[in-house]
Amino acid sequence: MAEYIVAIDQGTTSTRAIIFDKSGSIVSTGQLEHEQIFPKPGWVEHNPVEIWNNTREVIGQALSKADLTRHDIAAVGITNQRETAVVWDKNTGEPVYNAIVWQDTRTQPIVDRLAAEGGVERFKPIVGLPLATYFSGTKIVWILENVEGVRERAERGDLLFGTTESWVLWNLTGGTDGGVHATDVTNASRTLFMDLETLSWRDDILDVFGVPKSMLPEIKSSSEVYGAVESSSLLREVPVAGILGDQQAATFGQAAFDPGESKNTYGTGNFLIFNTGEEIVHSKNGLLTTLGYKLGDGKPHYALEGSIAVTGSLVQWLRDNLGVISSAPEIEELAQTVEDNGGAYFVPALSGLFAPYWRADARGALVGLTRYVNKGHIARAALEATAFQTREVLDAVNADSGVDLTELKVDGGMIANNTLMQFQADILGVPVVRPVVAETTALGAAYAAGLATGFWENLDDLRKNWKEDRRWEPKMDAAERDRQLRLWKKAVTKTFDWVDDDVRNG
């Protein structure tokens, strides 16, 4: 009897395979980082071949650590960094260009061109998203327009597009030898091409973008058998049965299945998702309307999302670019050497600002500096930036939904940072709750795969698995909270309109 599920978590900085048991507990993990490629300012790329090779290797790591074989595995689930665009040749399996990552801002001129008629919200009533460099659609256009010969090959029907889950699925299920070219509704909802109501590609929008429909994957639910593993002998014949974009997967892994439930993931960026149930809620406050999940033939569940571009990656930047710390966990020790931020505020608009501002022209700023400020204050200001940005997104959720959040469920790498979690509770004025299993992204993908294959029977099975690990209660008084928020918002305004038109369009 197969007692376990493998979740492949293809993230922004690494690819992991995590094996879960029926209780949702982690049995073993394999993980490999991949190279972050920065060819020019604002450009971020990954090598898709490296990602696929790493995927195969981490599956082997996880299985060998747990001393398991394919016969012990009931199903495979995939979760992924969303929006990151891969275009490859279906005949050779070779990518035509590196994957263009969600953080990449090179497509701003394409966004401006598309927004010239109808503005950045031109397609928002249909797809739930503003025109922005963040989403896959403009990245595909850039590859079609800038890589030699690609437009002609795409028109001939030789090229396929997918976000990284599609790339991994296609390779896992056979690649050039019958690989399944599919995506799920959550990932499809991040392209700018999918109609939120019909859950299908919009021909009229594809025509405006100039993207051949033949490139696009088939849209499926988040929980069904897409195909069986072929090429990886370690998991041969195991069904691939769950796909969720990483933030939707984390929401699913937090058992936030019902309207009004939410979670905030602290990773490279931060992503707050608020479940709106079967209702499509169009934001008036800078949030995205997106798919939450769709289980097999069931009705789709929708969500509001606040995406923050730079949170955990600010800590990486302090480590790698400035050498302020030598490892990410040191940021907390450094922040604890001071009582407060010393009047310094760090707005990490390193790739513009996402929700709720959507300002591609913003750039990072460290403000409020005096001779008093030291690196401890800067470390604290960097951590606090994550909490302030989360507060602004939550304010937008409250305004759109009319529901005030009573507590915030959290997950992701940064929730190990107790200093940050306490400040988050302080600046929100509501408790922050951490689950026992912090790897909720991979867990969500495992849940989707397990539901499709009968490993778990229903959502109640999954709710029983969720357990609280720790809770932080707010300690800051309201006057101090208001003062800090006022200064933060003042700091944010200093980052606007930083990119000159000649630079942006050059």
Swiss-Prot record:
Glycerol binds at residues 82-83, 134, 246-247. ADP binds at residues 12, 16, 268, 312, 413, 417. It holds the Pfam family FGGY_C. Pathway: Polyol metabolism; glycerol degradation via glycerol kinase pathway; sn-glycerol 3-phosphate from glycerol: step 1/1. Transmembrane segments: none annotated. Keywords: ATP-binding, Glycerol metabolism, Kinase, Nucleotide-binding, Transferase. Its EC number is 2.7.1.30. GO terms for molecular function: ATP binding; glycerol kinase activity. Sn-glycerol 3-phosphate binds at residues 12, 82-83, 134, 246. GO terms for biological process: glycerol catabolic process; glycerol metabolic process; glycerol-3-phosphate metabolic process. It catalyses: glycerol + ATP = sn-glycerol 3-phosphate + ADP + H(+). Inhibited by fructose 1,6-bisphosphate (FBP). One of its GO terms (cellular component) is cytosol. Key enzyme in the regulation of glycerol uptake and metabolism. Catalyzes the phosphorylation of glycerol to yield sn-glycerol 3-phosphate. Belongs to the FGGY kinase family. This is Glycerol kinase. It comes from Leifsonia xyli subsp. xyli (strain CTCB07).
